[in-house]
Amino acid sequence: MPVAMPVAMPSAPPLLIRHATLPDGRTGMDLLAEGGRFTAVGPALPAPAGTEVIDAQGWLLSPPFVDAHFHMDATLSHGLPRVNVSGTLLEGIALWAELKPLLTEEAIAERALQYCDWAVARGLLAIRSHVDVCDERLLAVRALLEVKRRVAPYLDLQLVAFPQDGVLRAPGALKNLKRALDLGVDVVGGIPHFERTMQDGADSVKLLCELAAERGLRVDMHCDESDDPLSRHIETLALHTQRLGLQGRVTGSHLTSMHSMDNYYVSKLMPLIREAGVHAVANPLINITLQGRHDSYPKRRGMTRVPELLAAGVNVGFGHDCVMDPWYPLGSGCMLEVAAMGLHVAQMTSLQGQRQCFDAVTVNNARILGLEGYGLTPGCRADAVLLQARSPEEAVRLRAQRLLVVRSGSVVSRMAPAVAELRLPGRPAHVDFTRQAAPPSIETAR
């Protein structure tokens, strides 16, 4: 694939965003960005000479959205070479195997770049993408490494070496995974529940955690993406995380078998996950779609135990996982849609639960990726998204418009407000779907 030079972001003058509401509830706040960082936050800040000033008009200014689990090598490939008729995880894997021989670096890169455009417009400025290494050519690896380089000025792309067909099960997978890491892939991935036996799955976890420890890398494994309550590789992942001193650097993604596990066993498992400092990622849109496909009724929701993990002290993030690919025909890079689905599936409709779901696509995911300088305090990177909402809860409810997206102090995307014009006698001329009355506080709400 021809190598294109990345286009650097132009040097930006100071940027002052006035009259913003922050996720912690503070209103009338100004944020000054200089040299790609926030240098001051507070009310009525003075504007240095030459500053671009933007009036937030009281709308919610948030750190950008972060996606902790995605498959960019497959994104926007829906219908190639056919569609997933059953809608199951296994047919999706089989369909991906049919598609892989037909892929080119150029096609993978072009689809990925288009998706990154969507992401920026959605205020999604950091993505962790798994990339399949079970291909001797490593086409997807090479394509996404090039995409990572090209989008670096405006989006942080973190890549996981993912042995889709099993690192022990697929011939050459371990060698290819190491090659991918040598080329510059950031994170060690795995899929223990897809190995031939439970023992092979456990062995793969040990092997891959040791590899990550040797190389000083993070770990993110597809773990127990199954309806089988006996799929318990997360406990092995937590064990080796502690043994190797990888606390805070390891993520268990999906963990859907926990939905079906015995409650007593889970009561022992959750403290182990917390003590090991293992992050958990649920993928609400995909878990509710793929899990429980073979159930009659009642059908399992399939998503892992999000509120219980949070209550146990585990850092939980949400991922989009798929957009228009062999596993999922829908999606558009909207992390607020992900948060809203997670809220519904986990029945987290309290004000606290709604806020936790917003955090699961922002600050929690930033911790999972280990993002430096994430936030809205002085010294943080001047990355932010202005949402047409007055609170995080309202942003989730409305899947709020991204009025403004800022990267390193430069505006990289603008979107018109969502406003409907009404022609009703005696009623307002416009509605934007925000509630005008003050909402109840968390303390007084039921």
Residue map of PLM features:
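Active-site microenvironment of metallo-dependent hydrolases
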Residues: 1-39, 44, 355-446
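Active-site gating loops and adjacent loop-to-helix segments of metal-dependent hydrolytic enzymes
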Residues: 76-108, 184-187, 208, 233-251, ...
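Histidine/acidic residue-rich metal-binding segments in metalloenzymes
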Residues: 139-153, 170-279, 295-318, 374
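His/Asp/Glu-enriched, well-ordered alpha-helical/loop segment
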Residues: 218, 239-250, 286-290, 300-387
